[in-house]
Amino acid sequence: MKSIHLKQLLRFTTASLFTMVLTSSPIFAADNEQVTVFAAASLTNALNEIGQQYEKEHNTKVIFSFASSSTLAKQVANGAPADLFVSANQKWMDYLVDAKAVDVNSRKTLLKNTLVLIAEKNSPITEVVLNGDWDIKAALKGNRMAVGDPDHVPAGQYAKQALENLKLWQAAEPLLARANNVRAALALVEQGEAPLGIVYSTDAKVAQKIKIVGTFPETSYSPIEYPVALVKQESTANAKAFNEYLQGPSAKNVFEKYGFGVN
């Protein structure tokens, strides 16, 4: 009986020591060192690369949630556990400032982008001059043009603004395929569901199945800017450190590689 009791005691002691080692080890600590970033869908490729780079250099896990800026901003306003928010326009950051959900002193315009017209890579459409003479209906041939939903998606709002200024909105509006975010609009063209789409130039840069067939004059839409800010109730040291990293030279190189303008 004593032998059995001794074995049980040894097993308990060994398990306890193992637990103590785990909870005090750097590996365990790393599991608790993380930062959660809510970011516009158009930043997916660039931020994923930056996140991987950051994890290699720091004892911190970076978790991303990518979607339309409008969707994410509403989630943050409702208390979603984000540490950092990066929007594809100033409007949705203003929304969070008004809701007192972000640290206004940490707000900074991080990036810039441009707007392009895309087609599937093998499309017979090669070049479109984007002005008031463009016959959208003829170009679409009974199909629809993919855009982020102008009612709430920044890319769609920029697209609407450009089309309005080029006197094309009235013809275009009934022919739109409205997507939940800019990457969804890109996917519609990639999959052949729409012959044309309006996306950011950075989205076109990472897509292998599409080509740019037109570039919207930058005077036809408001500057496409990406502000970043710390989420107020979650402003941890990890969040502040990653925010600084996003504005540093290593991240800048990645953003530029993906075609973003860096401030």
Language model segments and positions:
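Exported/periplasmic ABC-transporter solute-binding proteins
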Residues: A29-E57, I63-S70, K74-A80, S87-Q90, ...
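Bacterial N-terminal signal peptides that target proteins for export
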Residues: K2-T14
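Bacterial N-terminal signal peptides
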Residues: R11-S24
